[in-house]
Amino acid sequence: MTPGQWLFQAQQLHPETLALQGPQALTHAQLFDESLRLAQLLKRQGIRQQQLMAVQLDSSWQLALLLYAALQLGVRFLPLDPGMDNARRQKLLSLVGCDYLITEQSAVEPGLQVITLSQLIDQSVSANVNFHAEPLEAENIQLLIATSGTTGDPKGVMLTAANLMASAAASEDRLGLAAGDSWLACLPLFHIGGLSILLRCLAVGARVLLQEGFDAKGVWEQIAKGAVTHISLVPAMLDRLLRQAGDQPPHAALRVVLIGGGPLSGLLAERAHAAGWPLCVSYGMSETASQFATDASPDAGLLPGLVGLPLQGYEVAIAADGRIRVRGEAVMAGYANPEGESGKGLEQGWFETGDLGHLDAQGRLTVTGRADDLLVSGGKNIHPVEVEGRLMRCPGISSVGVTGREDPVWGMVLVALYTGALTPEALKGWVTENLPTHLRPRDYIQIDQLPLNQMGKLSRGALKNRLLQADKGDG
């Protein structure tokens, strides 16, 4: 059953249970009707099956409704970061062959039609009983996701309906999602980590509790009253949530705290476990339709980089150079390209993640970091994630990022930029006592805030620029 058919199935099996809760609360029957109504409006604007519709909106609620409408109409869907600048947007939309763009305000985009949100909202149209849904077939491209890199040319990841079906089934198998559960969604919906929540819940008839951005107080209130069974967070969000909760245990209804989007420090994992938070540490990306490995064991997160066994339908291998490769039913059809060819970015079905890692005797995957981030100092390969994890165990350190500075003797020396009350001198003294020589940074720079992207993940390019500025005396 394809994602477009999930809407019909959910309203048949669970018509009166809540499907989507945000500014409004919609049952599965109401969501089916509303998505069908929006699909009619989109069709009146000229949008047809298998055309590509990009959506760039501030409102997660409106974006979610348009996704469901796209499923009904059989339209390919591309959610865009509302902060994406015009030049980058034009380049991406040209690359992927976009037909329509839905935005808050009118815009000029060569070669495609722009529809403002008001044009859809202003049309008060009831669902036409003669209008029939036109869901895509399993092999059709259903979703495109813009890669989240902040540098370089944007790419569009092509995911078929079959990819999304396999991903939802694999997640359900590992995490135990079922009808009646409630997944709090506070990640951006233009990222696969956020958007996949909508699809997983739709597949089984669960509820999505949708928040506009991450508000630790609001999230904790929902968890504390037992309204949440599942939640997806990045490590920075988990830290803020634990602080908001005062390191109290969550309500017993919460069964899964899915962590992804970057490495989870052992110290943060220990805090969460001590307070009784049910962590599941995951690893995945847009190209794999979200998570493809997840550690759901009772001690998840306590071993650095361990992300557990691959999910059903995925095969993981380690290349000779240590890079992680993955293939399977949910791995993308390829990167969008003007020729419309599938398989771009894949090698005989394998996708190379660009991350380094290893598999243990049990088949569990450990991720050590990005291959491109590897630093070579004095002939030794050092990954900054390992150093950062150790530095975070120092009392008085709130956050830390490690980067490299070119050196005529060592090739590269490590530099730590950190936040916290500890002085650089005191931190250096702690490091001397606790870290082996090759993992010790040469310098320590205290800053007000680490550069993070919208997912709360350390931006290593921006961190490098901060170091260059500091070396020039610019702060």
Enumerate the predicted regions with their spans:
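AMP-binding/adenylate-forming catalytic domain of the ANL superfamily
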Residues: P436-L458
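AMP-binding/adenylate-forming catalytic core of the ANL superfamily
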Residues: G328, G334, L356-L439
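Conserved AMP-binding/adenylation subdomain of ANL enzymes
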Residues: M165-S182, F190-H230, Q244
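Conserved AMP-binding A3 loop
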Residues: T27-A29, Q142-A169
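Conserved ATP/PPi-binding loop(s) of AMP-dependent carboxylate-activating enzymes
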Residues: L306-G313, A319-Q348, K380-I382
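Conserved AMP-binding/adenylate-forming core of the ANL superfamily
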Residues: E16-G46, A54-S60, Y68, D85-Q90, ...
